[in-house]
A protein has these predicted regions:
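Short hydrophobic beta-strand element within catalytic cores of glycosyltransferases
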Residues: 301-304
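Glycosyltransferase donor-sugar binding loop
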Residues: 205, 228-245, 262
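Short alpha-helical donor nucleotide-sugar binding micro-motif in glycosyltransferases
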Residues: 263, 271-276
Length: 377
């Protein structure tokens, strides 16, 4: 190796680049790390209107934008990488884990467990056991798992996955996309929908399925005809959706005060959040709903069913309700008490700050660095 003085010159093929900067008669040596290559594997965007695709795109967008000096992020490429991040559990991805080619550290993203599919998809009884075994077999093929729901950790441990192989990293949203709209824009939207300035509006969002509490949302609209209800979302999985035929009939002939706009664009969804006097998600079972983070980022007051998950991830920054009757009472309370509604709106801002891009970016960078280092051992 050629030398000049006491400073060796490294070739560019090595893991570190030696940058020599001359300042007067001094030589400053800066060591620059080689970028990590992260290969994302996901088919989530093939299915519109479901949260996994939104969470995936937000992460990839953030890393491309703000981590380009540390990471090279690729998507669905058959290449060598420091970390291969599996976002969905497609069978071809499962088979790829047995290949000898260097995929680096294999990371699995746990967006659901077999039990959470109940009330979402219509799975024939004879297939349920097969699906459960496949899901856990896929997760076991991973060298580390990331959960978006901290409640999943105990379930994974109970299924035989070592606790030290599981890390909780929450979802987040892009504040450039999800933000409040000016009052004049909100007024225009109300006019567009034929709603007066003082009409109280409750907005919900998500796939139309039993697990989301859509039955309670419909009943609330029937019991509160003076309130306008809007549910954005549809049947992302078509006829496989649990209760598809029944909900399809309701969507085709809803109560007069209930609007089903279907699966909408992010731009339209932002407008609906802006219209909301109250955002209501009456789900019985949730993973880590992107809709809550989106609504909070748009400063919509949040009301939810009282689930253990929310107590952990939202820390009281929402109105908890035990059942449909409590939801009904709370809606009437907020309609009559603007001060209480304003207080709930301030709590939504706390949620938005907690799950900021800046905070989560550093968490992901640290995580990928650690996992890549383990993969090199």
């Amino acid at each position: 190796m050629e030398k000049r003085g006491n400073f060796p010159l490294f070739s560019s093929s090595l893991s570190f680049l030696l940058l020599i900067l001359f300042k007067e008669n001094d030589i400053i040596v800066v060591m620059e790390k080689k970028k990590l290559r992260i290969n994302m594997l996901s088919s989530s965007e093939k299915v519109a209107g479901q949260g996994v695709s939104g969470a995936y795109r937000e992460l990839v967008r953030l890393l491309h934008r703000d981590a380009k000096d540390q990471l090279i992020v690729t998507e669905n490429l058959p290449i060598e990488a420091d970390v291969t991040h599996f976002h969905t559990i497609d069978f071809p991805y499962y088979l790829s884990t047995f290949q000898k080619k260097r995929s680096g550290r294999k990371i699995g993203y746990v967006h659901f467990l077999p039990d959470t599919l109940e009330g979402s998809l219509k799975i024939p009884f004879f297939l349920k056991g097969i699906v459960k075994r496949y899901v856990f077999s896929f997760y076991n093929r991973m060298e580390h798992l990331v959960v978006v729901n901290p409640m999943f950790i105990e379930d994974l441990v109970a299924a035989g996955i070592p606790r030290e192989k599981v890390t909780y990293i929450p979802n987040f949203v892009n504040k450039e996309k999800w933000h409040p709209l000016p009052q004049e824009e909100v007024a225009r939207l109300r006019t567009e929908l034929g709603l007066s300035d003082n009409q109280f509006i409750v907005v919900g969002a998500g796939q139309v399925q039993k697990r989301k509490g859509i039955d309670d949302f419909i009943r609330l609209a029937e019991e509160l005809p003076q309130i306008t209800f809007i549910w954005a979302g549809g049947f992302s999985f078509g006829g496989m959706t649990d209760g598809y035929e029944r909900y399809k009939k309701v969507m085709e002939n809803p109560p007069k005060n209930l609007i089903f706009p279907g699966i909408v664009s992010p731009e339209r969804m932002r407008e609906l959040y802006a219209l909301a006097d109250l955002f209501l998600l009456p789900s019985y079972n949730e993973l880590f709903p992107m809709t809550i983070l989106e609504a909070a980022s748009c400063e919509a007051p949040i009301m939810l069913r009282d689930l253990d998950l929310y107590k952990v991830i939202l820390e009281g920054n929402y109105r908890a309700t035990a059942d449909r009757e409590e939801m009904k009472e709370a809606i009437l309370e907020y309609q009559a008490n603007p001060a209480a509604l304003k207080e709930l709106k301030e709590k939504a801002k706390n949620i938005s700050r907690e799950y900021s891009e800046e905070h989560l970016l550093q968490i992901w960078l640290d995580f990928y660095e650690k996992q890549a280092a383990l993969g090199r051992k």
